[in-house]
From Swiss-Prot:
Organism name: Dictyostelium discoideum
Domain F-box residues, every copy: 348-394
Gene this chain is encoded by: gacFF
GO molecular function: GTPase activator activity
Pfam hit, one: F-box-like
Subcellular location: Cytoplasm
Annotated protein name in UniProt: Rho GTPase-activating protein gacFF
Chain ranges of the PH domain: 464-571
Assigned keywords, A-Z: Coiled coil, Cytoplasm, GTPase activation
Known function: Rho GTPase-activating protein involved in the signal transduction pathway.
Marked site positions, Arginine finger: 744
């Protein structure tokens, strides 16, 4: 340390520890306790030459990040009794026998001054630790006095320095300081500044802050002078009222402008001038916010943005399209395009002059229709309304949904009618789907059909792809270079494009009945599989040897998803048949034992109905509890009929066992005395009169595609949710509600994959022969592989905001959650209706299954891909949300 030992920074707190200091520190501790003959202990006047010295552990100011652990550093300490100062340095230079002074050390020396304000005490938590600290103020008044005085001094000096740099007037050097200060204060012009200092200004001029600080005199607190509640609140209130009046006047101006334009175009300019004169008289804002006549007259020109904002109230309830456009073809005297754009921008920027929080606050109390008008006119709200999250942005500033200001929920209907919705969650989606069914085909589909026509394959029947994504394809040339291509799977054809938006495909891979799919070796490339085609690569029976297609993905899960989907397409592909499906044969012989059938006919299957009734009676006798279905699904056929009337999936097992036995006997008996040719002819007749059950992929496909394929099956047309969910969830409701660890215990992966293949291939399934946990795993797998979420992102975020809204009552929150569920797509609504009903029954039986609502959320939320707030409140308020009174 250079200079005086007191030049170090003042100590607030210094902690010294004698722990693990060796013999010297131990003797120091003993000497301080009253031991005799120790050189580090001062005893009376006779030992003035002796000093306290030794190594101590000093607490460092630095600490480990995110930790409260104390860090101690070893320092050499000695005490000078003459000056009352405790010195310390890094080392003692090895001289322990002679007393050390600050001048005898070459290292930096720091000091601790012992004064009357210093407190020295033993640590309470650790006995081998002493604490030296200065006296700190023990009252809040002193702290506020210092804080307020210093802040005000800083603010005034900063303002004075700024005005000295920017002022253009020159003052005489002989003027007094008071005149200079007055000129500087008068040069500040800020119309939005909340009042001038008044008494505070004079008080600070008369007071010498530097003198007060040097003499350490107590300064009277200025908090009462600065924050005068009554005067400041009146000033703020007057400014807010002025802004509200100005906004209302601008709004009335725009509405009257439209009405005058529609009624009488000739008198339009006169009306605007009258309104402008009224506004200029009532406008309480400075000249920076005034609006000129040219700007308002220029707004008469046709502009999509302005006309849309003004025309929203007219077409508010009658518009079914996504956006509304109004064009004014009768406006005369149009100006140039450049002038028009400038004038419109200046008019819309009027609202952007307000602070963001004040704009939001004022707009929140407007009517729904007026809110949308100002949302289009204001440049601030254009940013918020552009991403379809207008009501969610309310929550960011208010912690309360905007719809709470509108008890009649008109604001929500206005929002849904005029917002730009995403594909899959709007009413226009079904309109587009109906148009596609009517035969509207884009250029991309035409080129795809043209690409596969050279192979002799029938054109594409669907306009939507089963799966799309980027894959790496190995080239067919000699170098075998891997190239990234965009693959599109349509029906049984796999197209690949160079770019995602290209219309012309680079090639096509046909997935016919002779195609094989295998996993490539790890030495080729990671996450790689190959597609092998037979020699008969075309239907024209032209023999052509084809090299395998090698495809690769970035992730292992994507590779497995592609392979599972392609395998299902290959197995279900029947290009040589008229329809997709599995052949089901119903015998025509009089002998019932020789029937061969996987029957889908509901009229000629009396034995199966009797067996199912017996199975239901047996299940009830075994003590299994039955539950009523939700109101919507209870209108559908019963659970047992749905199991037997669909693709042969049975909940019991009695009737299905007999059918399998008769199926085996029919092929082993040889026809019961009839000739082989007669049996062959009989089989041909049965095949010709076969009833086909369509097969389609159910996993990794959009809900709309699944339900579209499901509508082709007569026994499943009444279902409003995917068939696999209807069967599995109803089976869980009837058999697995009280199963311990339901949805938590993992089922066999092989059994889950087997169930998946059976459902997609339309095989006969006896759910009683499978583990209930495997069925739950199948349900979770279905939700996990959905390519989209069940709830839109804005609605999902809005549900969290409703949950956090502290100003809403419970009934208001229920209405908000009901609105959220009603705003999602119809398919997702029905899925949630059955799923939440099942989860509610599980929670009610938590004493048996040990599954509380917290445990359910842990295992089910990663698969549903939505906010847990929706699931929790959907279970809690199920009757109020889904049951219509």
């Amino acid at each position: 340390m250079n200079g005086s030992p007191y030049s170090s920074s003042s100590w607030v707190k210094s902690s010294l520890s004698t722990n693990s200091l060796g013999s010297l520190s131990n003797s120091y501790a003993a000497g301080s306790a009253g031991g005799s003959g120790n050189r580090s202990t001062v005893r009376g006047d006779s030992n003035k030459d002796q000093k306290l010295l030794g190594y101590l552990q000093k607490q460092s100011k630095s600490q480990l990040p995110n930790s409260n652990v104390k860090i101690f550093k070893k320092k050499w300490f000695w005490f000078e009794s003459d000056s009352g100062t405790l010195f310390y340095s890094a080392t003692s230079t090895g001289a322990l026998s002679t007393p050390l002074t600050p001048s005898s050390l070459s290292e930096n020396i720091k000091s601790i001054k012992i004064t009357s304000q210093t407190t020295i005490e033993q640590s309470i938590s650790f006995r081998l630790e002493l604490i030296i600290k200065d006296k700190v103020p023990n009252d809040e008044f002193t702290v506020l006095n210092w804080v307020n005085t210093l802040n005000q001094w800083k603010k005034l000096n900063c303002n004075l320095d700024f005005t000295n740099d920017t002022t253009t007037t020159t003052n005489n050097s002989n003027n007094s300081n008071s005149n200079n200060n007055n000129k500087q204060y008068n040069s500040i012009e800020n119309p939005d500044y909340l009042g001038k200092f008044g008494e505070v200004e004079g008080l600070l001029n008369a007071m010498s802050v530097s003198t007060s600080l040097n003499t350490m005199k107590t300064v009277k607190p200025l908090i009462n002078k600065i924050q005068n509640d009554s005067e400041q609140l009146k000033l703020v209130l007057s400014q807010v009222e002025q802004q509200i009046e100005f906004l209302k006047s601008c709004q009335l101006e725009l509405i009257s402008h439209l009405s005058n334009d529609n009624n009488n175009n000739n008198n339009n300019n006169n009306n605007n001038n009258n309104i402008l004169q009224i506004l200029q008289q009532q406008q309480p804002i400075s000249s920076k916010r005034t609006v000129s006549n040219d700007n308002l007259v220029g707004s008469n020109n046709s502009n999509n943005q302005l006309s849309l904002s003004i025309g929203l109230p007219i077409n508010l309830n009658t518009s079914n399209t996504t956006t509304t456009t109004i064009t004014n073809n009768t406006i005369e005297g149009e100006n140039d395009d450049d002038e028009e754009e400038d004038e419109i921008n200046q008019t819309s920027d009027i609202f952007s002059l307000l602070p963001t929080h004040l704009t939001l606050y004022v707009f929140s109390y407007l009517e729904p229709k007026e809110l949308l008008i100002l949302a289009q006119v204001s440049s601030q709200w254009q940013k918020l309304a552009g991403d379809n999250l207008l009501w969610v942005r309310f929550v960011t500033h208010f912690i309360t949904p905007a719809s709470i200001f509108d008890k009649s929920h008109n604001w929500k209907s206005v929002y849904l009618a005029n917002t730009v919705t995403s594909l899959g969650y709007c009413s226009n989606y079904y309109y587009l789907k109906n148009q596609q069914k009517g035969g509207i085909c884009t250029n991309k589909e035409k080129y795809m059909n043209r690409a596969i026509s050279m192979y002799g394959v029938t054109p594409l029947t669907s306009l939507s792809s089963s799966k799309e994504g980027w894959l790496y394809k190995r080239g067919d040339d000699l170098l075998r270079i891997w190239k990234k291509r965009y693959f599109v799977l349509r029906d049984s054809s796999l197209f690949y494009f160079k770019h995602q938006n290209d219309n012309f495909p680079c090639g096509v891979i046909l997935l016919n009945h002779g195609t094989k799919l295998k996993r490539a070796s790890a030495s080729t490339r990671k996450n790689c599989f190959k597609i092998l085609q037979s020699k008969n690569s075309t239907i024209t029976m032209v023999h052509k040897k084809r090299m395998p297609y090698y495809l690769s993905t970035d992730k292992e899960d994507d590779c497995n998803d592609w392979m599972i989907l392609l395998n299902s397409i290959i197995k279900s592909n029947t290009q040589h048949q008229n329809n997709y499906g599995v052949i089901t044969i119903s015998g025509t012989s009089n002998n019932n034992n020789n029937n061969v059938y996987i029957n889908n006919n509901n009229n000629n299957n009396n034995n199966n109905n009797n067996n199912n009734n017996n199975n239901n009676n047996n299940n009830n006798n075994n003590g299994s509890q039955s539950y009523n279905l939700p109101p919507l699904l209870s209108k559908s056929p019963s659970f047992s009929n749905a199991l037997t009337s669909s693709t042969g999936i049975s909940g019991g097992g009695g009737g299905s066992t007999k059918s399998r036995k008769s199926h085996k006997k029919s092929f082993s008996s040889g026809g019961g005395g009839s000739g082989g040719n007669n049996n062959f002819e009989q089989m041909q007749q049965q095949i010709q009169s076969v009833h086909l059950t369509p097969i389609y992929p159910m996993f990794g496909v959009a809900l709309s595609k699944i339900l579209e394929n499901q509508s082709l099956i007569t026994t499943q047309t009444h279902l409003k949710i995917p068939f696999i969910l209807y069967i599995c969830l109803n089976y869980i409701i009837s058999k697995g509600i009280k199963e311990e660890g339901i949805f938590r215990v993992s089922g066999s992966l092989r059994e889950v994959q087997e169930l998946q293949e059976h459902f997609e291939q339309g095989r006969e399934i006896d759910l009683d022969q499978h583990d209930i946990h495997a069925i739950c795993g199948l349900v979770k797998t279905f939700f996990r592989k959905l390519p989209h979420t069940l709830v839109a992102a804005d609605l999902d975020e809005y549900s969290t905001s409703v949950q956090l809204a502290a100003s809403q009552t419970e009934d208001e929150k229920i209405q908000e959650f009901k609105f959220i569920f009603e705003s999602i797509s119809e398919n997702s609504f029905h899925i949630f209706e059955l799923l939440l009903y099942c989860l509610r029954l599980i929670v009610r039986n938590e004493s048996f299954n040990k599954m509380t609502i917290e445990n359910l959320l842990i295992v089910i939320m990663p698969t549903l891909k939505c906010s847990p707030v929706l699931i929790t409140n959907g279970i809690k308020y199920y009757d109020e949300i889904f049951i219509k009174k």
